[in-house]
């Protein structure tokens, strides 16, 4: 029995399935189906007077419900006030207050409820949100997902409230057999009985006037026997039902009902009192469709249960089971859910407790963040010294990290970049990655640190920057870019280096150029790059390697002492090709300045006491000495040689006197280390140009 009071909180100006008390002031009425518990007050005198005093109050229902309602003379006064709405057709309705003229627009959509002929659900859409009233319904699991009008844009509509049929919202009725299963069980029982003889009759003991039409029509169609009913007036406009029913009592299947006074014919078990014409007694069995009786059973039973000598119970339900209700509500996931029926043996609070977890209002509205999985994160390690690197990865590196210190843009006047470029080189070759580039470049990832192995003496820090260099340094420091392209493997063994000499006036320092550009045998994180802080001079020499792809490593830098620079004794290198050679005997005075050499160039060639000096590759004598004087307008030089011992072109040039050619076994040992990616130890020494 429905306990719905007729009004919804979202749209209180309309009344549904209730037509008395406060509902008399409604602007519109809605009827879901023609069962008496949903028609309270529909033919009351007070409602009749309301209709007589109003011109814009109507009753909305489905076309089948309208036909069923008007077949009864008691409801014919509604004939001019009933408006039928087609199922699954959104219809706009104006709710007008005749006293104040206030108007409200809503859209109503009728959805099939599966309860009885003409039963529908009402979907209301308006300014107060979307609300669904189910009335009495029976929908199988997953059937709501197939209703297109419950969806919008491929997803379920945002429903504010659902007024739900909770007749069997009780765990006792967790699973109710479907109508097809119930029909199959009843059909087999009826067939087995009526086929015995013409005197075997079945009585379907149905208490409701509407709702069993599904059972009647299917039995008649399968067995070819019409079902006897008391009257056919309500089905006269429904030929699909009328064809399977009859008022002739001479049939083997009866669904007739007892009179109101519950009078029984003593000579017959059938309500209609039919007997055989030749006085042969009839063999009658009764089948009572029921659901509540099966819900009270303590153990699972069959669809058909024999309760007496000639009586049976058949499980047949007009309402959704407990599992079907939960499936329907969890799919819609409304904000609120209100029960329309209090199940037998329970209370309203228990029903609300069951429905509440299925609504959005009980769920946390805060977004729940879930991890994407186990991700690699940087590990924080506290260091005592600021000079140590932070390990960004969990796994140790394949080789030990070299200690680095943060790079600071401090100008050191003693360090200059010397580049040798021949004047015979085309203009395009001068703009190689090792040369100055005019466009602004982004700093390399290696430019933030310099190796701790590089030492700056106290004398270098105390010497100031000449005034003549102040103007050039500011404009040059922004014209440099680190070229860290990864070299191809063939670069290690096939190279033709053309080393030339040319005076360039404005050349960027090696520090701003992005540090060492030596081949990366490991990863970018191996920490083996070397950065030299230097300054630019008006005259510098740069070694250009034609065809270099990522082998633009910075070569040895010969640092001039402050005494030699102040006295103006500068070595002049004019149009002469240079290449590195090995020299065993180096004066002690040569160790006063740093000679920074690439780590992959000359390690393990002779011994750790060997170093690199620059000698002419031709027969022209060129010396680096403090007695050599040049004009004072010449700027300081920063000698930078690209010692590439892996290039085969180094040994095709005629040897310089007093130069010692590398031995084959030394080169083989060096190449094997480079090929396997092993690090080459470099021992750096301080030297002075005056000792050369």
Swiss-Prot record:
Subunit structure: Interacts with LIG4; the interaction is direct. Interacts with ATM. Interacts with BRCA1. Interacts with PRKDC. Interacts with TP53BP1. Also exhibits ATM- and phosphorylation-dependent interaction with the MRN complex, composed of MRE11, RAD50, and NBN.
InterPro entries: DRMBL, RibonucZ/Hydroxyglut_hydro
Primary location class: nucleus
Subcellular location: Nucleus
Enzyme superclass (EC): hydrolase
GO molecular function: 5'-3' DNA exonuclease activity; damaged DNA binding; endonuclease activity
CDD domains referenced in this protein's UniProt entry, alphabetically: artemis-SNM1C-like_MBL-fold
Functional description taken from the UniProt entry: Required for V(D)J recombination, the process by which exons encoding the antigen-binding domains of immunoglobulins and T-cell receptor proteins are assembled from individual V, (D), and J gene segments. V(D)J recombination is initiated by the lymphoid specific RAG endonuclease complex, which generates site specific DNA double strand breaks (DSBs). These DSBs present two types of DNA end structures: hairpin sealed coding ends and phosphorylated blunt signal ends.
Phosphoserine sites (modified residues): 385, 645
Comp. bias regions, Polar residues: 507-520, 544-555, 640-650
Protein modification: Phosphorylation on undefined residues by PRKDC may stimulate endonucleolytic activity on 5' and 3' hairpins and overhangs. PRKDC must remain present, even after phosphorylation, for efficient hairpin opening. Also phosphorylated by ATM in response to ionizing radiation (IR) and by ATR in response to ultraviolet (UV) radiation.
Keywords: Adaptive immunity, DNA damage, DNA recombination, DNA repair, Endonuclease, Exonuclease, Hydrolase, Immunity, Magnesium, Nuclease, Nucleus, Phosphoprotein
Gene3D superfamilies for the chain: 3.40.50.12650, Ribonuclease Z/Hydroxyacylglutathione hydrolase-like (3.60.15.10)
Protein family: Belongs to the DNA repair metallo-beta-lactamase (DRMBL) family.
Segments for region (Disordered): 503-555, 640-660
Residues with the Phosphothreonine modification: 380
GO biological process: adaptive immune response; DNA recombination; double-strand break repair via nonhomologous end joining; interstrand cross-link repair; telomere maintenance
Protein name in UniProt: Protein artemis
One GO CC term, this protein: nonhomologous end joining complex
EC numbers on record: 3.1.-.-
Phosphoprotein found in the keyword field: yes
Species classification: Eukaryota, Metazoa, Chordata, Craniata, Vertebrata
Low complexity: compositionally biased ranges: 530-543
């Amino acid at each position: 029995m429905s306990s719905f009071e007729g009004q919804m909180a979202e749209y209180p100006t309309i009344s549904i399935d209730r037509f008395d008390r406060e509902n008399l002031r409604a602007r519109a009425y809605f009827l879901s189906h023609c069962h008496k518990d949903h028609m309270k007050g529909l033919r009351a005198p007070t409602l009749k007077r309301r209709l007589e005093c109003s011109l814009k109050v109507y009753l909305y229902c489905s076309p089948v419900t309208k036909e069923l309602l008007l077949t009864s003379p008691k409801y014919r006064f509604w004939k001019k006030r009933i408006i039928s709405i087609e199922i699954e057709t959104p219809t706009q309705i104006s709710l007008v207050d005749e006293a104040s003229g206030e108007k409200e627009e809503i859209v109503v959509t009728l959805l099939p409820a599966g309860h009885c002929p003409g039963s529908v659900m009402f979907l209301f859409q308006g300014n107060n949100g979307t609300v669904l009233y189910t009335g009495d319904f029976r929908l199988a699991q997953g059937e709501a997902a197939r209703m297109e009008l419950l969806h919008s844009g491929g997803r379920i509509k945002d429903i504010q409230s659902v007024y739900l049929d909770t007749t069997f919202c009780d765990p006792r009725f967790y699973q109710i057999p479907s109508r097809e299963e119930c029909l199959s069980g009843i059909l087999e029982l009826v067939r087995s009985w009526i086929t015995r003889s013409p005197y075997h009759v079945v009585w379907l003991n149905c208490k409701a006037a509407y709702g069993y039409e599904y059972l009647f029509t299917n039995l008649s169609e399968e067995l070819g026997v019409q079902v006897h009913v008391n009257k056919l007036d309500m089905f006269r406009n429904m030929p699909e039902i009328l064809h399977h029913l009859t008022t002739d009592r001479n049939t083997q299947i009866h669904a007739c009902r007892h009179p109101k006074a519950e009078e029984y014919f003593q000579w017959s078990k059938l309500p209609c009192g039919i007997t055989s014409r030749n006085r042969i007694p009839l063999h009658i069995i009764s089948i009572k469709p029921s659901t509540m009786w099966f819900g009270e059973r303590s153990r699972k039973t069959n669809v058909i249960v024999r309760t007496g000598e000639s009586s049976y119970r058949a499980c047949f339900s007009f309402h959704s089971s407990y599992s079907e209700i939960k499936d329907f509500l969890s799919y819609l996931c409304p904000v609120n859910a209100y029960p329309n029926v209090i199940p037998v043996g329970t209370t309203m609070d228990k029903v609300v407790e069951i429905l509440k977890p299925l609504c959005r209002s009980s769920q946390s509205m805060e977004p729940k963040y879930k991890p994407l999985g186990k991700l690699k994160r940087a590990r924080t390690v506290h260091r005592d010294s600021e000079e140590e690197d932070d390990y960004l990865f969990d796994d140790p590196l394949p080789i030990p990290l070299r200690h680095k210190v943060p790079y600071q843009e401090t100008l050191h006047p003693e360090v200059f970049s010397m580049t040798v470029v021949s004047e015979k080189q085309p203009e395009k070759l001068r703009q190689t990655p090792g040369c100055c580039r005019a466009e602004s470049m982004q700093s390399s990832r290696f430019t933030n640190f310099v190796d701790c192995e590089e030492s700056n003496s106290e004398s270098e820090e105390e010497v100031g920057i000449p005034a003549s260099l102040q103007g050039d340094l500011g404009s040059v420091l922004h014209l440099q870019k680190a070229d860290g392209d990864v070299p191809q493997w063939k670069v290690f063994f096939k190279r033709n280096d053309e080393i030339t000499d040319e005076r360039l006036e404005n050349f960027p320092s090696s520090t701003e150029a992005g540090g060492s550009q030596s081949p990366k045998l490991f990863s970018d994180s191996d920490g083996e790059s070397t950065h030299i802080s230097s300054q630019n001079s008006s005259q510098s020499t740069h070694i250009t390697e034609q065809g270099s792809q990522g082998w633009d490593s910075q070569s040895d830098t010969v640092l001039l002492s402050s005494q030699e620079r102040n006295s103006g004794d500068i070595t002049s290198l004019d149009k002469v090709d240079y290449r590195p050679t090995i020299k065993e005997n180096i004066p002690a005075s040569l160790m006063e300045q740093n000679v920074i050499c690439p780590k992959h160039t000359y390690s393990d060639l002779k011994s750790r006491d060997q170093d690199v000096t620059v000698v002419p590759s031709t027969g022209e004598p060129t010396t680096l000495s403090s007695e050599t004087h040049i004009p004072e307008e010449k700027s300081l030089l920063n000698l930078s040689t690209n010692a590439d011992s892996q290039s085969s072109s180094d040994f095709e040039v005629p040897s310089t006197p007093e130069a010692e050619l590398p031995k084959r076994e030394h080169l083989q040992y060096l190449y094997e280390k480079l090929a396997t990616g092993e690090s080459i130890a470099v021992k750096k020494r301080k030297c002075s140009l005056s000792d050369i």
